[in-house]
Amino acid sequence: MTASHGTAPSPFKQPRAVWAVAFACVVSFMGIGLVDPILPALAGSLHATPSQVSLLFTSYLVVTAVAMLAVGWVSSRIGAKRTLIAGLVLIVIFAGLAGTSNSIGGIVGFRAGWGLGNALFIATSLAVIVASASGGFAGAIILYETALGLGIAVGPLLGGELGSISWRGPFFGVAVLMFIALVATIAFVPNLPKPEHKTSLAAPLKALRHRGLLTMGIMALLYNWGFFTMLGYAPYPMELNAHKLGLVFTGWGLLVAAFSVFFAPRLQARFGTAKVLYVNLFCLGIVMAVIAIGVNTPAAVIVAVIVSGAFIGINNTLTTQAVMLVSPVERPVASSAYGFVRFIGGGLAPFVAGKLADATNLSVPFYLGGVAFILAIVVLASGHKLVDAAEKGAVEGEPVCPSLQRVGATPAPGYQPVIVAVGAIENADEIVDAAALMARDAGRPLEVVHIRETAVVEELAIDAEDAEQARATVLSHLDRLFTLGIAATGQVLTSVGDHAAAGRVLAQHANDIDARAIAVGRSPRGQAAQFADGSFTTAVLHNAARTVVMVEPGKAPHRLSA
């Protein structure tokens, strides 16, 4: 894999195609937060009740949920770029129409069309960025996560500023920004090849027959029930104008972004997925109870909502991770199935909350949201053994915990190789060849360990390469080394989201076979990303009782220290 020392390639040196899609991602992730500050103003201007206004969330999220079942089918037939453009066109049209509407019913209907466009966009945007990015897979993921964090944090601020002028402002703002992104996407994003494998329309629903995926999906539904109850109804008891609501939800969004990207992976690595989710869901239940009890105290509601951003950020990351851990199907199919169940919960919650608030009082929906968070703990507990088994590698299907698979011939016992760990990066051949020279000088064989990486972002999971491509890469290294007269063997190390865990697995493997040394290259992810989700190289250094060296083309290998 890679080391954290020195200067990493910048993920922000990208082609115009990547920046076009990344800009659209920022606007898309603004989505919910952009609308939240205008909810009270919208209700007042259109003489609508909070329960009627809540249908803006319901129509948007329910349509997004249902569309998630079909986006894989669509994109595998017309290609990622056309799917992306279709999504952007729909968002531009329906966001603009929502801004021109003079009735709450009209806005609710146009939000449904917006939700369809959103589903088409979010399901393909990450794949387009990865396919178009320079500097490798890691740089593309960093850029996408940056767009995610920026959109979540800035959305409420922009919504508050535009909403202070008119409740129509955020709708027109999205339409204009997405139109700019649409033009840039058409102009700069190249046509991408269609997938070789066409996704079945029924595949996501069939995937839900697997107990693990269904269990984690129901947990996500309950979590989203509580989350969108808070998001849809908390603005009313705050008694703030659009500008001040925007500032409150900006604080919330900053915590969501920070804890999603920086803290959730480290907590997961330290305590495990299930344990962190138990505590986190319980804390969210407490926050909802505070809002319910203090519903007539605006300051209490404001503080509780801002604090909830930390727990929401952790849950958004780890819930998807849990889904991918237990899912035995292809990850894009698992993402679609999970997105369907997740958004259904988010869509129904505001509708039910509105009916409850009308029939009782405003505190009851928040109590129900708190109960939903606690029920999510119960559902997670029913699947705890599945998550634990997945983290230990004892499940069928695609590998979800770091695992090694031998490629080519099995070496004789006691071969004590030099191990080189390298990912799908541009100079992988040069790193392997530099390590091969080091192994030859030491009189030892070389073992090439190729890192096959899967990134998990929000409800999406994407592979840098499939299993066959990773295997072919290792065989290519072995063939090249054979022509150079260097004895070598190969393995593929599968890593799903957790780089540090992959480093620990490699370190243990090196200890088990009494490897002479471990060679790594320089990280393409950068120090900030490595701090966020754990450094592969740091984990190797802390867990391997071996010499760890960094190899770079044209430079002498040098030893690393913990």
Task: Name these PLM-found stretches.
Residues M68-G79, F259-T273, A357:
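Helix-to-loop junctions at the C-terminal end of transmembrane segments
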Residues F110-L150:
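Cytoplasmic helix-loop-helix junction between adjacent transmembrane helices
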Residues I142-A187:
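Helix-loop-helix hairpin linking two adjacent transmembrane segments in secondary transporters
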Residues P411-I462, I486-T489, N543:
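Small/aliphatic-rich secondary-structure junction motif
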Residues V66-N102:
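Conserved MFS/SLC helix-loop-helix module at the cytosolic interface between two early adjacent transmembrane helices
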Residues A517-N543, P557-L560:
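Glycine-rich, Arg-bearing micro-motifs that act as flexible, cationic patches
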Residues A175-K194, I377-H384:
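C-terminal membrane-cytosol helix-exit motif in multi-pass small-molecule transporters
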Residues A274-T319:
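C-terminal transmembrane helical hairpin of 12-TM major facilitator-type secondary transporters
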